[in-house]
Amino acid sequence: MMRSLALVLAACGSVIAAAPASADWRSQYRELGFGVIPVETQTQAMASFEAFIPYASQKLGVPVRLFTASDFIGVNNALIAKQIHFAWSSSSAMAGSWLECRCVEPIVAALDKDGNLGYNAVLIVRADSPFQTVDDLKGKIVARTEPNSQSGFLVPTIEFAKMGKPVDRFFNSPVSGGHTQSVLGVLNGTYDAAFTWTTRGDGYGQIRTMIDKGMLRRDQIRVIWESDLVPAPPVIVHRDMPADLKETLIEFFVNLHRDRPDLARAVAHGETQGFVRVDLTKYESTIESRRMLRDARRRGG
C-alpha cells in the first residue's frame, strides 16, 4: 500500500511540476505591445527602437509590437485598456493613472550614469538671454509641457507653489505639448524659459536626447533652476498581469544593460548603468503630489 501511495504522490508531483509549463504566459499572449511617447516624431521613435523591438521579441519569445501616442496619458490609457502590455511612462502619469484605477504599477526604472535612481526637473533659458534667476522671469513666458509630465508640469507646479511663486500667477505659463516643443520653443524665442528634465552631467533625459539627435548644442541653453532628485521614469504594467510574465519582463530589463548596453541606452534616453526593480513605494511622494494637485483643482484652487 505504501508503494501505491508513493506512486500516486509521484504522479501528482509530475502533474504539479508540469503545470507551470502548460500555464506559461506565452500560451495566453501571442504578442506583447510596448508603449512609448516619441521624443521627436513617430517615425524617429520607430527608428530609435528599430533594434530594440526585434531583440525584445527574440528574448521574450513572442513578437513585440511598438505602440506610440502623443502623450503619456495616451500610452497609459492603452495599457489600462490592455491594448498594450508594458510601457515607458512618466512617474507623474503613472501616479495619476494609479489614483484613478489602482490598476497600474512600476516594475523597473533606469539608473543614471552615476548610479542614481532619479533625475532633475530643470528650468532652462537661452544662453544669450538676460535671465539669470527665477525672479528675472516674473511675468515672462515660461512653458510647461503637459499635465501628466513629472518634470515638465507636476514638479514645477508643486515646488514653485511652495516657494510662493505659483507657476500660473508668477509666470505666463502656456502648455507646450511636450519636452521637445518646450526646448525648441526656448531656442526659437517662442518661450523665455521652459521646464524639462535631465540628470547630472546630462547623462540621460531630454537635453541628452536632443544633443545626440543634433537638435541642440549644450552651449545654447543655461539652467537657472533645478529640483531635488525625483523618481526615475518607470516601465509600467497592468496590475493583473500574470506573475510569470511580470517576472520575465523584469528579468529582461534588469539584464538589458549587461547584454545590450546600446539598447538600454535607447530605452533610457541616454547613458545609464542599467535598469533595476522598483515598486510603488518608490513613487509614494509622486502619488501624494498628484493627489494634492487633483484635490486643489477640485476645490478650484
Regions found by a protein language model. Give the residues of each.
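Bacterial N-terminal signal peptides
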Residues: 6-17
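Boundary at the C-terminal end of the N-terminal hydrophobic targeting segment
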Residues: 17-23
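An extracytoplasmic/periplasmic, membrane-proximal ligand-sensing/linker region
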Residues: 25-51, 237, 241-301
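Short loop->beta-strand "edge-of-pocket" segments that line small-molecule binding or catalytic clefts
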Residues: 32-39, 136-152
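Short helices/loops that flank or line small-molecule/ion binding pockets
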Residues: 73-87, 100-101, 119, 135, ...
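Acidic, polar ligand-binding/catalytic clefts
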Residues: 77-136, 157
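Pocket-lining segment of extracytoplasmic ligand-binding domains
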Residues: 129, 141-244
